[in-house]
Amino acid sequence: MTKENPTFAKTSTGAAAVTQLTLTVFRLNGLLLHCGDRLVKPLGLTSARWQVLGAIALAGVPLTAPKIGEAMGVTRQGAQKQLNVLAEQGLVEARPNPAHRRSPQYILTPQGLALYRRAEALWAVQADDLAKLITSAQASAATQTLESMLHQLQIVNVYSEIES
């Protein structure tokens, strides 16, 4: 049961539940980034750089900065900032993009892939610990709910951009 907060406008029960979910996601995101920073710090990474490596690794194909930003839920500029650092460290490499001369595609270098795998191994231990507290059914239900919410917000965002 949620507490009544007089600073919020009166809303339907459904809207109040979605608001609580959103606030929980904000807190969880902050905590995941903080924990991720601590987890990968010994590897010389931050959560943001780990996410960029992951976006490229999981895509399985070279990606542009906008596509990496989209996969991470950040702006192209935010992704590009991390890509620049990772390129300087020799962890990613820019390749020419035949479809767009000014938007290179990025791949992981062998060092980048090895570092990403080390970060994922560290995360696997954390995930196993969390899996002792959260059932796979709970995790699946939460994922389904959040993916549905993400999909709806993406639709709204596309319509907003078209109207602007």
Residue ranges of each PLM-predicted region?
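C-terminal regulatory/oligomerization modules of transcriptional regulators
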Residues: 1-13, 136-164
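Charged, amphipathic alpha-helical coiled-coil/dimerization segments
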Residues: 7-8, 84-144
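Alpha-helical linker/hinge and terminal dimerization helices associated
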Residues: 28, 32-35, 72, 115-134, ...
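N-terminal leader segment of winged-helix/HTH proteins
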Residues: 1-43
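Residue-level recognition of specific faces of alpha-helices
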Residues: 24, 49-55, 71, 82-85, ...
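N-terminal helix-turn-helix DNA-binding core of bacterial DNA-binding proteins
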Residues: 30-75, 161
